[in-house]
Amino acid sequence: FFKNREITKIDTLLSLTGFSLVGGPAYNSSKEAENALSLLGVPYLAAHAIEFQNLSQWAKSDGGLSPVETTILVALPELDGATNPTVFGGRLGEEGGCSCCSEKRNGKEKSYDMVPCFERVNSLAEKTYNLVKLRKREVADKKVGIILYGFPPNAGAIGTAAYLSVFHSLFNTLKAMK
């Protein structure tokens, strides 16, 4: 559907399902997702509407997403290769949703209705647009910041990570950008 013979017809794949690309909320097949994404060769972004709390509860929460939401809405899509997890909406709730959007509502929504957070939808659209723009920019014109992990500090552990060849990967990345 996203390809015309060998040519990919999309610049980015944006999933709004709130769970794994291949499977569902209770099952995922990261291998099948990896195969599909490899064939497309485009970035994969996953955004989601929160399900287990309403927008107002989420906005007021010190903890953000619940552990179940974090697993289903963030971790499973990331296993597939998704980036940029973003909340774009959720249930309105008795409080009327998020404070940034209450004036934009038509007043006909019920507390249990799923509604967008317009501010976050606009932010998601802007991030997606900028990612597409960045991918189309010449490699030599891209500006890249590199952060290397170093823990414990002052112990000569810069660039260490379990089961990862950090400097080899960094070298290959920089070489590809030359």
Where are the predicted features?
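An N-terminal assembly and electron-transfer interface module characteristic of large anaerobic redox
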Residues: 1-178
